[in-house]
């Protein structure tokens, strides 16, 4: 695996695209599982407890690594390991999220806002100390609308954002040996589109008669497709359904809203200081110490990630200088 110049994220994205080709894996592509890795690494955030989220790459350690909801994600992590080893200057947390947005773009989806600055927990002890137990926070496909709102509402997402994010089911498939469910949602599960919403609205879905958990099925273009109870809840709920209909009718609208919602998702838990790096606010508060801001704010140089100039870089989690420039003066470790 090739190494790239430190901070050259565009070159790194090209390397990520290369490792997406996995002939021996699902449908020949690692793309969908890379998106799932970014999603699950971020989707355990809590606004109430203010923990979880993409910072730290906590899934490298228990309890996240053994959370049943994360079953199968070791494939995504292993696909990225050679790239991580060749480019140790990037944190796991940044690489996982960058891989997710790169995969979406490479599979025909929208460009997702992304910026570096996430840090890695150095040990299981550090992960537990700063993150706590964030298990049982991801969606359960067997449940309904109330559960979906509870899970996504904990992260601060609206009904519209919930439906937009559900469009990630355009990608990949379920596995009986992981979630218990089985099959893809769409005919081409390695191409990002609004096909999921179009199929969801078609009156073709019937309960599958099998030994696994309850799910729906339909045969489309000779392919057995499936929908989960959480998917069907989107057309049964009077607030969710209008957004399903809008996204089925307008792929450009879906792409725009998905990009905004996914960009928000991968920033959850990334509490940045004015250098652009995630900070250990909890640790600093507990120890009564000031936050570590050893790198000076960027001046008038151009950020190689966003193209913004120096202190003009704006983020979902707050403003500050370019995180890449700050990276030159600070070790990306917690």
UniProtKB/Swiss-Prot annotation:
Active site location: 40, 185
GO molecular function annotations of the record: heme binding; metal ion binding; peroxidase activity
Top-level taxon in the UniProt lineage: Eukaryota
Keyword Oxidoreductase among record annotations: yes
Residues where heme b binds: 169
Entries under SUPFAM superfamilies matching the protein: Heme-dependent peroxidases
GO biological process: cellular response to oxidative stress; hydrogen peroxide catabolic process; response to reactive oxygen species
Keyword rRNA processing: no
Top-tier EC class: oxidoreductase
Residue(s) at site: Transition state stabilizer: 36
Protein keywords: Heme, Iron, Metal-binding, Oxidoreductase, Peroxidase
Cofactor note: Binds 1 heme b (iron(II)-protoporphyrin IX) group per subunit.
Enzyme Commission numbers on file: 1.11.1.-
Cofactor: heme b
InterPro entries registered for this protein in UniProt: Ccp1-like, Haem_peroxidase, Haem_peroxidase_sf, Peroxidase_I, Peroxidases_AS
Disulfide bridge partners, by residue number: none
Protein function: Destroys radicals which are normally produced within the cells and which are toxic to biological systems.
Similarity-based family: Belongs to the peroxidase family. Cytochrome c peroxidase subfamily.
This protein's name: Putative heme-binding peroxidase
Lineage: Eukaryota, Fungi, Dikarya, Basidiomycota, Agaricomycotina
């Amino acid at each position: 695996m090739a190494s790239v110049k430190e901070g050259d994220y565009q070159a790194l994205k090209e390397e990520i695209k290369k490792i997406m080709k996995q002939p021996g894996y699902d449908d020949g592509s690692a793309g969908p599982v890379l998106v799932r890795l970014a999603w699950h690494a971020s989707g355990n955030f809590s606004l109430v407890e203010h923990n979880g989220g993409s910072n730290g790459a906590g899934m490298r350690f228990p309890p996240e690594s053994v959370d049943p909801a994360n079953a199968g994600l070791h494939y995504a992590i292993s696909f990225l390991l050679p790239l991580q080893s060749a480019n140790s200057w990037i944190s796991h947390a940044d690489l996982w999220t960058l891989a997710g947005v790169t995969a979406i773009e490479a599979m025909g989806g929208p460009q997702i806002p992304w910026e570096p600055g996430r840090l890695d927990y150095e040990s299981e002890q550090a992960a537990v100390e700063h993150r706590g137990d964030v298990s049982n926070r991801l969606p359960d496909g067997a449940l309904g609308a109330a559960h979906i709102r509870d899970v996504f509402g904990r992260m601060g997402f609206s009904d519209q954002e919930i439906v937009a994010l559900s469009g990630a089911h355009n990608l990949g498939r379920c596995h009986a040996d992981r979630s218990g469910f089985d099959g893809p949602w769409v005919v081409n599960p390695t191409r990002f589109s609004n096909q999921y919403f179009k199929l969801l609205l078609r009156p073709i879905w019937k309960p599958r008669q099998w030994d696994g958990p309850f799910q729906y099925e339909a045969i489309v273009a000779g392919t057995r497709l499936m929908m989960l109870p959480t998917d069907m809840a989107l057309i049964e709920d009077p607030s969710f359904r209008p957004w399903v209909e809008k996204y089925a009718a307008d792929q450009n609208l879906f792409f725009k809203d998905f990009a905004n919602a996914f960009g928000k998702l991968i920033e959850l838990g990334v509490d940045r200081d004015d250098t652009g790096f995630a900070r250990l606010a909890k640790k600093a508060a507990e120890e009564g110490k000031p936050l570590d801001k050893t790198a000076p704010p960027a001046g008038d140089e151009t950020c190689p990630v966003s193209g913004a100039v120096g202190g003009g870089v704006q983020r979902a989690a707050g403003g500050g200088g370019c995180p890449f420039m700050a990276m030159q003066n600070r070790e990306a470790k917690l």
